[in-house]
Amino acid sequence: MKNKEIVLKAMNDLFHEKDSSAIERYWQKDYIQHNPTMANGHEGLKKLLTLLDVNFKWEPGIIVEENDIVITHSLVNGWGTVPVIVVDIFRIKEGKIVEHWDVVQEETPPSKAVGGNLMTSFNQKKI
């Protein structure tokens, strides 16, 4: 399985299927989490699952794989009160996610954007 396939499967199983066993399958036990609001390792992910809105939805669009790094540009609903645009950066080692960074920004509708553009002008990939 390619690294980007690992990331897509991991995120789908954990966040869409709500399958907590995906944590053991796809994340290294002591993975490093660079988001300052989340803990490292499996326990941080397990806690996150309990905090997510039941309507949480992660829609990846642009996906880039370069060696051991996978980057996704996604639309996320249910993270907060408004949709957010997220760039996730994953480092993969031996088939597991070992490190994660992200940048999160509230979605601005085109009617309020200076250029009038969507923040996700790509075709959303449904998984």
Predicted regions and their residues:
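C-terminal and inter-domain tail/linker signature
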Residues: 1-127
